[in-house]
């Protein structure tokens, strides 16, 4: 089910050109939040979603939404001005118990407060978030924002969330960034291995995330590599001493010149 935007169905329809049999598609053009299609087909084992970022939706202006089984478990609705977490709750609701969902997200959903923090709390406390992957900026057409991928699962082995910083996994192409196959393989390998790797990835207990006020920003947990040049203080002090000595020599020469000028004057 796609959001009620022409480009969504156009992108979906274009996939028919990628050598995939048309009988494997069931394309629906509707509103995923207020009028979803494919009710008879859910739950799904695999869900991939790139919903529009921070669009408006009915939210609590529609009294039916808070009782909708897709949204009601969180006890609160996503803000009317930012539907991001409504799309996430929709995907979670339609996900099979053994399935996996991957949703491209606007970064604000990871740290904004209010109702969105309450929804994150629901997702973390119920152990539904498997992984957060920070992507490079300038990756998608129409926005330079560094987006992220939220991976959802309903049957996880550990009560933890995996964080991957893939913000540097790209190549520059004109004014945009692009993921090469090597970049994608690196990200996938990190996700599969679920190993702590300095400046790249870390597995964080959900209790620690709760202590961080349910902030899911990757930078909160994966420390950025310090690329600043290491300065040798001894060498720096020696250079400063040379400058001070040179400055004094110049001052003496200037004073000598001034004295000679005064004599001739």
What are these regions (language model features)?
Residues 5-6, 20, 94:
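Generic structural signal for beta-strand residues in well-ordered domains
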Residues 14-42:
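S-adenosyl-L-methionine
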Residues 1-12:
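Single conserved hydrophobic/aromatic residue that forms the stacking wall/gate
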Residues 32-265:
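A conserved structural/catalytic subdomain of Rossmann-like adenosyl-cofactor enzymes
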């Amino acid at each position: 089910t796609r959001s009620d935007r022409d480009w969504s169905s156009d992108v979906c329809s274009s996939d028919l050109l990628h050598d995939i049999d048309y009988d494997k598609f069931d394309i629906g053009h509707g509103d995923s939040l207020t009028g979803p299609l494919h009710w008879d087909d859910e739950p799904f084992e695999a869900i991939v979603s790139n919903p529009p970022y921070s669009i408006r939706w009915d939210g609590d202006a529609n009294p039916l939404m808070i009782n909708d089984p897709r949204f009601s478990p969180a006890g609160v609705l996503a803000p009317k001005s930012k539907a991001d977490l409504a799309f996430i709750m929709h995907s979670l609701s339609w996900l099979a118990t053994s399935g996996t969902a991957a949703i491209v997200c606007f970064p604000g959903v990871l740290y904004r407060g209010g109702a969105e923090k309450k929804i994150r709390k629901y997702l973390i406390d119920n152990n539904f978030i498997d992984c957060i992957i920070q992507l490079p900026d300038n990756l998608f057409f129409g926005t330079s924002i560094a987006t992220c991928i939220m991976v959802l699962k309903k049957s996880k082995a550990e009560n933890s969330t995996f964080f991957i910083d893939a913000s540097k996994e790209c190549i520059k192409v004109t004014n945009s960034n692009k993921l090469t196959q090597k970049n994608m393989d690196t990200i996938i390998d990190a996700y599969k291995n679920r190993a702590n790797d300095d400046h790249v990835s870390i597995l964080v207990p959900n209790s620690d995330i709760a202590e961080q006020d349910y902030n899911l920003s990757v930078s909160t947990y994966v420390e950025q590599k310090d690329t600043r040049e290491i300065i040798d203080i001894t060498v720096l002090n020696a250079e400063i001493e040379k400058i001070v000595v040179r400055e004094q020599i110049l001052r003496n020469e200037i004073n000598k010149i001034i004295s000679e000028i005064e004599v001739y004057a």
